[in-house]
Amino acid sequence: MILIIDNYDSFTYNLYQAVGTLTPSVQVVRNDSLTVSEAAALQPQAIILSPGPGKPKEAGITEAVLEELKGQVPILGVCLGHQAMGEVFGGTVTLAPHLVHGKADDISLDRSCPLFKNLPPVIKGARYHSLIVEKESLPPELLVTAETHAGEIMGLRHRDYEIYGLQFHPESIMTPLGAVIIENFLSHVGALS
């Protein structure tokens, strides 16, 4: 089962649909409807932290999931979930130099990252965000996997754990190859039946 932590965002059900085309076992729970222990007791094969409004610290159990389940359950954070990943592991989340809502930008990929297997070096990615993880604040255990031409971080991976973050939205129609990214994540962590 894939567990999606819903951070009260309309994109959550786009994620649900994208995952549901790959595996029938998907469950969505609100970020304040259960504890991390209760989430772990569901025995998910992977957890996806959804986009959402506000700051990562205000997103229910989202940051606690990263802190308490690292190394136990593979995790993919999208937008707010990505920012939570950056913050939990020592990065700084700050106001983006340019607010971007509903724009598809070119995103350069590190194709050694399992999420970007069989993708071209640059893809279009949908951006809807006011905050970013500041590159200068990254600890050594967080590796940049995707960025804009201006150098804004669009993807992260943890050096030691199966934890990945995407600032852009793979579930959006404005990310034409987004379904491949989601499938690559689920396949890489062994979560496809």
Regions found by a protein language model. Give the residues of each.
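Catalytic beta-strand/loop cores that center a nucleophilic Ser/Cys/Thr
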Residues: C113-D160
